[in-house]
Structures are given as structure tokens and as C-alpha cells.
């Protein structure tokens, strides 16, 4: 990013935004040049992407972790596969979407889950607003965990709305290996949130890493 000569103000290490200049705006996103003060008192600029749809809610959208529970079956994580033009190919993701004006994150999560997968569930927990790619955008989401009763009649044959997505259910206890297999077979990309979740499951169930003894 561009930088300018240091100013005489703000030499105490505090960083803050000075100004934001609109460069280009489309229907869904806009590009801005953000001018800010770095810890040394130098004025710098940063190119930032922001959504045009943000309202008064605390986050732009929701990402749903749907846990499908059925009697005598392993728990499964319900994912969606869809074509993403910016990636130029297919991606595996959590069901997700923007929060409508006046809608709670929990309500948005249940709505998006049903629209994309056809499943109906119950909210187990909802995270605070968390950032997604802070080096590029100010976009934030609530991560909402939803449990799905697979024994319920309404979830026996879920009917998602036609959104050009494929619903994939993978065993929770083998999620990372199944994702790696799909990547190798279909040459798609896994969303970082999904892969991080799979890695966390693996690490949580694995033996602690051995720390080698130091030799003196």
C-alpha cells in the first residue's frame, strides 16, 4: 500500500482511521481507499472492500454449522457445494447468507439453512460478530451452530429452494479426511471456515503433540 511521510502527531502508537474515499461502487460491494495513522505517526493508505448492504445489525451475515443427528447414525455436518465466480470453480462451504433488515442472526441462520438445504433445525449457539478477511474487507458474520433432528418427519426428505447448490452431508468424526478426498477427486476449494472447523475437530480428538526433550 502507499505511504506518506510521518506526521508530527500521534507518536504514541495509537492507530486510527483518518478518512475513507469511495473509489468504485457496484450493487453489492464497493471499493474504498482508507487513510489511517500507523503506530509511528506515519499516514498510510489501504484499499478496502465493503458490502453496500450493511444495515444497523451487528454483522453482515451468518454462517451456519448444521449438525445432523439421527438415531443409530454418526453425526454429520451439512455443507453446500456451489460455483463461485471469483474462485472460477466450485467451493464447499457452510450454508450462509446475509442478514435481512430487522432480522436476528438466529432467525437468519434458520432461514438460510432451510433455503439452501431444506433442513429445519434449532439454534444451539450463536457467536459474536467475527471478521472474515480483515486484510481485505470489513465483512463480518455470526457463526451459528444449529442442530437438526434427522428423525423428524419434516427432515426425512428435505427440499431446498432451487439456489444452484448441492447439499453434502459428511460424518463429523471423519470430516477432514472426507474433505481432502473431495478436493483430490473433484478439484474444488474448501472454504477456510469449513477446513478450520475440520482441523479443530481432528486436533481436539487427537493425542497431544509430543514435545521433544531439550538436550543440553
From Swiss-Prot:
Cofactor requirements of the protein: Mg(2+)
Protein name per Swiss-Prot or TrEMBL: ADP-sugar pyrophosphatase
Function: Enzyme that can either act as an ADP-sugar pyrophosphatase in absence of diphosphate or catalyze the synthesis of ATP in presence of diphosphate. In absence of diphosphate, hydrolyzes with similar activities various modified nucleoside diphosphates such as ADP-ribose, ADP-mannose, ADP-glucose, 8-oxo-GDP and 8-oxo-dGDP. Can also hydrolyze other nucleotide sugars with low activity. In presence of diphosphate, mediates the synthesis of ATP in the nucleus by catalyzing the conversion of ADP-ribose to ATP and ribose 5-phosphate. Nuclear ATP synthesis takes place when dephosphorylated at Thr-45.
Encoding gene per record: NUDT5
Record's comment on post-translational modification: Phosphorylation at Thr-45 is required for homodimer stability; dephosphorylation results in destabilization of the homodimer. Dephosphorylation at Thr-45 promotes the ATP-synthesis activity.
Modified residue annotations for Phosphoserine: 3, 10
Organism: Pongo abelii
Reaction(s) the record says it catalyses: D-ribose 5-phosphate + ATP + H(+) = ADP-D-ribose + diphosphate; ADP-D-ribose + H2O = D-ribose 5-phosphate + AMP + 2 H(+); 8-oxo-dGDP + H2O = 8-oxo-dGMP + phosphate + H(+)
Sequence motif Nudix box, location on chain: 97-118
UniProt xrefs under Pfam families: NUDIX
Binding site for Mg(2+) 3: 112, 116, 163
Binding positions for substrate per the UniProt entry: 28, 46-47, 51, 84, 98, 133
Residues annotated with N6-acetyllysine modification: 207, 215
Keyword match Cell division: no
Oligomer and partners: Homodimer. Interacts with PARG.
Binding site for Mg(2+) 2: 112
Keyword Signal among record annotations: no
InterPro entries: Nudix_hydrolase, NUDIX_hydrolase-like_dom_sf, NUDIX_hydrolase_CS, NUDIX_hydrolase_dom
